[in-house]
Amino acid sequence: MLTKAPRGTKDITPKEAYKWRYVENKFREICALYGYEEMVTPIFEHTELFKRSVGDTTDIVQKEMYSFKDKGDREITLKPEGTAGVVRAFIENKLYADTQPTKLFYVTPCFRYERPQAGRQRQFHQFGIEALGSDTPSMDAEIIALAVQFFNEVGLNDLVVSINSVGCPVCRKEYNALLKEYLDSKADILCDTCNERREKNPMRVIDCKNPTCKENIKDIPFIADHLCDDCKSHFDKLQEYLKEMNINFVIDKTIVRGLDYYRKTAFEIISNDIGAQSTVCGGGRYDGLVEQLGGPKGISGIGFGLGIERLLLTLEGNGIEIENPQSTDIFIVTIGEEANTRSFKLLKDLRQNHISADKDHIERSVKAQFKYSDKINSKFTIVIGDDELKNDTATLKNMKTSEQTTVKLSTLVEELKQKL
């Protein structure tokens, strides 16, 4: 057990870590283009934060959160998603006092107790965007455009952007009464989960994953057909803006998302992987959340989250390879004790000039040193022997062309700066 990671967690080894850095750097690059700044929040928060934001009746709160009491008898939860913590930080640090909108991004681990499977771990990692202080559909369109551009730039172009409107408290009041009446008539054929949701949060029934139950409610009324004038206008404008940016989309009335804080726009982005579809991003608008968590009234928000593990699996499934950018510029092969000692100064000089360099540290033979230099894909190998030291020289080998030249040690660093 001591040498095995806990179920639902995974080590990111050097053979994989560069892929993570690549997509993370690309995400940061795209966020900067859109004017988003990084927000870093703790990996644990007060449990009540998630109960009030994500929702008491959600699967996340009821079944999936890692919650515990700390030594001060405080209820603490490892964050299962990124939005609640960012909104809490927005309120606590009074970012609403700055010029609005506040445009934030985050890169964070999250934790949910789920059955581990491909692309879904108990500790997983998310990129996320939150834009607070704008209730306009243009903000919704920008968020979606940012996500699409990010996916395009990492190589995912065959995307389906699915959008819906889940309404607001005004249109939901009438709709929920209609929905409750419909679901009550189906109570005998609903699954246990849906019957529980029918009482507490009827719209969540639309999100049911039980195939039999879904078939039984295939004629369920959708909120998108019962929007108030304001929500309908908002949704129509969003579509207009997406069309203007040539972002292809479909309207999917079944998208309600699994969190209680969504209002108006909800969306998912799906990648058409080889032989399967994979949801790589989901988000929506949460206009009442800031006030609900104790912040000022009237501050709207919208955001999305995307799982890094699932993204990397999707890239792999689409045959998109990420090249490892890390390689060693120079490897020093030493022959003799004095040459080995003198190589340390050369190694230091190279590194201080921002030339990546390495040498043997386990007393390999000369042949094994050359073999190792080739294995790590070094660009040049420098050979230093005791005899060469007397003449202040070394042999420089180009590992790609196998060309060898004799160079002066005193000018070697400057020569390499020209060659690299």
Swiss-Prot record:
One biological process term in Gene Ontology: histidyl-tRNA aminoacylation
Subcellular location, record wording: Cytoplasm
Documented EC number(s): 6.1.1.21
Superkingdom, natural source: Bacteria
Record GO terms (molecular function): ATP binding; catalytic activity, acting on a protein; histidine-tRNA ligase activity; transferase activity
Keyword line: Aminoacyl-tRNA synthetase, ATP-binding, Cytoplasm, Ligase, Nucleotide-binding, Protein biosynthesis
GO cellular component terms attached to this protein's record: cytoplasm
Pfam families: HGTP_anticodon, tRNA-synt_His
Top-rank EC class of the record's enzyme: ligase
Reactions catalysed: tRNA(His) + L-histidine + ATP = L-histidyl-tRNA(His) + AMP + diphosphate + H(+)
Subunit structure: Homodimer.
Family per record: Belongs to the class-II aminoacyl-tRNA synthetase family.
Protein name: Histidine--tRNA ligase
Gene from which the chain derives: hisS
